[in-house]
Curated annotation (Swiss-Prot):
Functional description taken from the UniProt entry: May catalyze the final step in cell wall teichoic acid biosynthesis, the transfer of the anionic cell wall polymers (APs) from their lipid-linked precursor to the cell wall peptidoglycan (PG).
Species annotation: Oceanobacillus iheyensis (strain DSM 14371 / CIP 107618 / JCM 11309 / KCTC 3954 / HTE831)
Residues spanning the membrane: 16-36
This protein's encoding gene: tagU
Name of the molecule in the record: Polyisoprenyl-teichoic acid--peptidoglycan teichoic acid transferase TagU
Membrane topology: Single-pass type II membrane protein
Length: 320
């Protein structure tokens, strides 16, 4: 049960789907769920959200990526949950790499701790979530520098990205009626009490639920686990998506809060060739330790751990 700290009870809502990555599954299910009457509206929203990386202007790269999706090769998609507040450029406080292999119908969900100490191209060593605002300030683009940083850190190719404004995530949860999760430990934050066990969250509660880390004995790793749980639960529920009356509202929210380099063709290809991986997800954590450097706390990851992550994801992608 979730309650206000003054013990005011909140009514539970029905369990409905909403993916933290927003666009990918919701749009695919809208298209596949028989509501073709709004296909043009879906297309318009996808056009609004479509924001290619600067490197996508290279026709050879575009040809390579298009061929990769067409031939059902494994792909890596970087999810960026960006927390934008007044006077803030935004930071990618949620970074999750989805590695999807359609040949085995398997998916790896790798959570990247936001305080991971890495080399950010053009900036030097810093927290990995600072790549996003640095990219904006440097004029190369927040998603662009985030993708480049993840690629160079783990020596893995990122084929697509999805960026979600976390405030839009809150609106989306409300639009579809809430999400149900299993809370591993009771805690209070943001004016809410989150009981241990199965709880149903509205948008604001869900945002507070995935943001908390200071009360979690596992810190960022516990926070990442809650984020993954919200995503997995929503993806599983999305298979029975039926809120057609909410479709227009959800599309508006997506158009205002999501950007991605996935166009309509790639989204339809994901629906056709990649959707089966939703039922076989392996979660991965990055092991490391906290260390204070020049008065700032960082999450230090060894070269051996970086190599392990690379090896597991590369092996997963090469499976037939």
């Amino acid at each position: 049960m979730v309650s206000r700290t003054e013990r005011k009870q909140h009514k539970k809502r029905r369990k409905w789907p909403f993916w933290l990555g927003g666009i990918l599954l919701v749009l695919l299910l809208l298209i596949s769920g028989g509501i073709f009457l709004i296909y043009n509206q879906v297309g318009a929203v996808v056009d609004t959200m479509h924001s290619p990386l600067s490197r996508d202007s290279d026709p050879d790269r575009q040809k390579e990526i298009n061929q990769l999706y067409k031939e059902k090769d494994a792909v890596n998609i970087l999810l960026l949950g960006v927390d934008e507040r007044d006077g803030d450029l935004g930071r990618s406080d949620t970074m999750i790499l989805l590695s999807i292999n359609p040949n085995t119908d398997k998916m790896i969900m790798l959570s990247i701790p936001r305080d991971t100490y890495v080399n950010i191209p053009g900036r030097g060593m810093d927290k990995i979530n600072h790549a996003y605002p640095f990219g904006i300030v440097d004029g190369v683009g927040g998603p662009d520098l985030s993708v480049q940083t993840v690629e160079e850190t783990f020596n893995l190719s990122i084929h697509s990205y999805i960026r979600v404004n976390m405030e839009g995530f809150q609106q989306g949860i409300d639009a579809v009626g809430g999400v149900t999760v299993n809370n591993a430990q009771a805690f209070s934050t943001g004016g809410y009490n989150f009981d241990q066990g199965q709880i149903t969250l509205d948008g604001k509660q869900a945002l507070e639920f995935i943001r908390m880390r200071k009360q979690d004995s596992r810190g960022d790793l516990g926070r990442n686990d809650r984020q993954r749980q919200v995503i997995q639960a929503a993806m599983n529920e999305a298979a029975s998506f039926s809120s057609i009356t909410k479709a227009g509202e959800i599309l508006d929210i997506l158009g205002n809060n999501v950007q991605t380099d996935l166009d309509m063709d790639k989204l339809q290809t994901l629906l056709t060739n990649y959707a089966g991986a939703r039922n076989n997800i392996t979660t991965m954590e990055i092991e490391g330790h906290g260390e204070t450097i020049n008065g700032i706390w960082y999450y230090i990851v060894s070269d051996e751990e970086i190599n392990r992550v690379n090896s597991e994801i590369t092996g997963h992608m090469q499976e037939q």
